[in-house]
């Protein structure tokens, strides 16, 4: 890679070091400064003329500073007559804001794509985009790599009874991700769904009205009850982030209805269904005193549950799901696995203290403080630098990268 160079932003120096070592090249000498007024200054101290430049900058806890720094580096390389500029973004910032979830929302991920293009980027390499459709936001080539081969290899090597495990999606939006991993490992999969706030008054009125309906309606309710009693469907209530005892037998559709769904007019009123972002937002935004429902579709009894999501950001949904899997569904243990470990605030501490979670597994796409790793004995970090380094090498040499979608590095 004589005509190539790699430049690292300030977001993830450890990953830069790992990738550079694998490629056998020394990172380009750059000066990253911040003025007293908060502005970012970038100085590239080596020539990049006619070079194939790869800029490594991931999302970080200072996401806006990291993004602005990346844009300035791209612009500086463009002004320095670089032959081609590739932004290597293991975790793409603002990827969760890739659609309008409410009226008058901004599609921020598309704006970030436009900013990168205007700055002068020629190519983007990223890993496990939150929504693969985001590739359509760009007018430049995008290579969306997968962490799945590395995660699958880790499972084979480190989970003793992985052949009997079940891959579980934390929400319906992650079904495609989970089924893909399940197919790779030849395992069964299961799905978890959480509904919105239940209204006891609404449910009681609904049940009272059921009693006055015709025999046909009563038959429908009975069938619903039988369906919910099947072994592969496990429903429970949770409150204050924990599963609660429910002595009341679920016998009516009101158990999975809510006043919110009945009265709220939203973006899904004309069809479609909420995504995993909406599920997460529902859990975090509802009143902490609101009783809610969680349902598992699948069988994890006596098995290891591999609870999968692309990002681990808020602990509440993982804790509730893990407690439900162990207490109500009979799972032997729960291993939480995600590509991007965005452990903000007390997230990692809360996951560590959860008795139902045995292990937390992430890749090093997102910078994690070394002290946090030392303090959390449940945390395992998979090195993903091999995938990124091989993608950089193949891109520079004009080779196909489809090989990376199936093989671990």
Curated annotation (Swiss-Prot):
It comes from the Eukaryota. Mg(2+) binds at residues 128, 130, 143. GO terms for molecular function: ATP binding; kinase activity; magnesium ion binding; ribose phosphate diphosphokinase activity. The modification Phosphoserine is found at residue 199. Keywords: ATP-binding, Cytoplasm, Kinase, Magnesium, Metal-binding, Nucleotide biosynthesis, Nucleotide-binding, Phosphoprotein, Transferase. It is found in: Cytoplasm. It catalyses: D-ribose 5-phosphate + ATP = 5-phospho-alpha-D-ribose 1-diphosphate + AMP + H(+). Belongs to the ribose-phosphate pyrophosphokinase family. This is Ribose-phosphate pyrophosphokinase 1.
